[in-house]
């Protein structure tokens, strides 16, 4: 997929990042990132050159990048944070060869393996999601795509969850055809997650059992069925900075409403085991770039934030406006109370919070 660059007219010239071999480097010109944020707020989209320059900026620029990105985030989302809750409704047993995934057929990671959970387990998890202040309950299965039994299970449980707990439902079921997307819409699913995961040019290096275009087609089916699209990616899989920029622009062109940015947790037993970790500064620059490219889209710091951002997690919420509360699919997240404390200390507010939440 090619995404045409926006016109460079009225745009801010990208700074010269001559010394990109050093994480120290030099400062960009004073006020550069504020001017770039103003450009975006005035309606002139960021260009690929500007986005790439942000990723190549020295670590000295990180505070300025985050501060400027916060202006954009605040314009569209104020100081609100939306919480998501993940439920691994079916674990392992996946026939796909996604190299980053501990549940894929090429993974030797010791993950739980079970078919789609029964009603009571899914309802119990929905109750936890509501108690933790989540607005959206994410039902996830490991599969190339849902079989008929799994589709029926989702169709049966979604109306009950929505009626009892007033949660939005995001379904992550793998590749979908047109009729499956229509059925999900009919049963009350609000949003479908299907990540692009990387750029089109890098995709065959992380998966060979389906294509980048397969994923894009699923998103088109979701859009055409009238549901919101949730799609993002994983950074730190050996891709180039240009690949990350391409993914951000592709998501923008598709009109994706919610963008989760994962930072690779190179799980032992997967083909990407031992992949060098991104620095917190590089992760922050990438998050900010996604915000500049997609100014009015929900941006979520997803898997890997605790591992890679570490003590800089709060800085991420100055550009992102959403996080998962609790654990991920096969890895642990930090304690929910730590997330509540972080949000409170930032002076931010949770969207859709409830009385049971300690914040």
Swiss-Prot record:
The pathway this protein participates in, as annotated, is: Cofactor biosynthesis; biotin biosynthesis; biotin from 7,8-diaminononanoate: step 2/2
Which stretches does the entry tag as region Disordered? 1-23
Q: Does the keyword Iron apply?
A: yes
Please list the reactions this protein catalyses: (4R,5S)-dethiobiotin + (sulfur carrier)-SH + 2 reduced [2Fe-2S]-[ferredoxin] + 2 S-adenosyl-L-methionine = (sulfur carrier)-H + biotin + 2 5'-deoxyadenosine + 2 L-methionine + 2 oxidized [2Fe-2S]-[ferredoxin]
Q: Which UniProt keywords apply?
A: 2Fe-2S, 4Fe-4S, Biotin biosynthesis, Iron, Iron-sulfur, Metal-binding, S-adenosyl-L-methionine, Transferase
Disulfide connectivity for this sequence is none
- Enzyme Commission number(s): 2.8.1.6
Q: Which GO terms describe its biological process?
A: biotin biosynthetic process
Q: Where does [4Fe-4S] cluster bind?
A: 94, 98, 101
Occurrences of domain Radical SAM core (ranges):
76-302
Q: InterPro entries, from UniProt?
A: Aldolase_TIM (IPR013785), BATS_dom (IPR010722), Biotin_synth/BioAB (IPR002684), Biotin_synthase (IPR024177), Elp3/MiaA/NifB-like_rSAM (IPR006638), rSAM (IPR007197)
Q: What class of enzyme is it?
A: transferase
| Cofactor(s) in the UniProt record | [4Fe-4S] cluster; [2Fe-2S] cluster
Residues recorded as binding [2Fe-2S] cluster, renumbered to this chain, are 138, 170, 230, 300
GO MF terms held by the record: 2 iron, 2 sulfur cluster binding; 4 iron, 4 sulfur cluster binding; biotin synthase activity; iron ion binding
Cofactor stoichiometry and binding remark: Binds 1 [4Fe-4S] cluster. The cluster is coordinated with 3 cysteines and an exchangeable S-adenosyl-L-methionine.
According to its UniProt entry, the function of this protein is described as:
Catalyzes the conversion of dethiobiotin (DTB) to biotin by the insertion of a sulfur atom into dethiobiotin via a radical-based mechanism.
Subunit field text: Homodimer.
Which PANTHER family does the UniProt record give? BIOTIN SYNTHASE (PTHR22976), BIOTIN SYNTHASE, MITOCHONDRIAL (PTHR22976:SF2)
Q: Identify its protein family.
A: Belongs to the radical SAM superfamily. Biotin synthase family.
Protein name (database record): Biotin synthase
What is the originating organism of this protein? Rhodopirellula baltica (strain DSM 10527 / NCIMB 13988 / SH1)
């Amino acid at each position: 997929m090619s995404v045409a660059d926006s016109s460079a007219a009225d745009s801010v010239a990208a700074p010269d990042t001559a010394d990109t071999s050093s994480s120290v480097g030099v400062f960009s010109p004073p006020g550069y990132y504020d001017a770039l944020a103003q450009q975006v707020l005035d309606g002139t989209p960021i260009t690929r050159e500007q986005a790439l320059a942000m990723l190549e900026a020295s670590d000295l620029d990180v505070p300025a990048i985050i501060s400027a990105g916060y202006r954009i985030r605040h314009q569209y989302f104020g100081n609100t944070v939306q919480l998501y809750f993940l439920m691994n409704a079916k674990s392992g047993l996946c026939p796909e060869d996604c190299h980053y995934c501990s549940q894929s057929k090429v993974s030797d990671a010791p993950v739980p393996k079970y078919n789609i959970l029964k009603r009571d387990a899914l309802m119990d998890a929905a109750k936890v999601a509501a108690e933790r202040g989540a607005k959206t309950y994410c039902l996830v299965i490991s599969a190339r795509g849902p079989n008929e039994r799994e589709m029926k299970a989702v169709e049966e449980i979604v109306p009950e969850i929505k009626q009892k707990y007033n949660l939005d439902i995001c379904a992550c079921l793998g590749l979908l055809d047109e009729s499956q997307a229509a059925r999900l819409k009919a049963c009350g699913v609000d949003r479908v997650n299907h990540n692009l995961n990387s750029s089109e040019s890098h995709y065959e290096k992380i998966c060979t059992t389906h294509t980048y275009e397969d994923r894009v087609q699923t998103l088109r089916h979701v859009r055409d069925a009238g549901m919101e699209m949730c799609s993002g990616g994983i950074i730190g899989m050996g891709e180039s900075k240009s690949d990350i920029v391409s993914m951000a622009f592709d998501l923008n062109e598709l009109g994706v409403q919610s963008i989760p940015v994962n930072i690779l947790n190179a799980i032992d037993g997967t083909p990407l085991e031992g992949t060098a970790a991104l620095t917190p500064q590089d992760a922050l620059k990438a998050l900010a770039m996604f915000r500049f490219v997609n100014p009015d889209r929900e941006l979520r710091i997803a898997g890997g934030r605790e591992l890679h951002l570490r003590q800089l997690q709060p800085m991420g919420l100055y550009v992102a406006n959403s996080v998962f509360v609790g654990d991920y699919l096969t890895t642990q997240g930090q304690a929910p109370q730590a997330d509540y404390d972080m949000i409170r200390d930032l002076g931010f507010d949770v969207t859709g919070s409830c009385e049971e939440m300690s914040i």
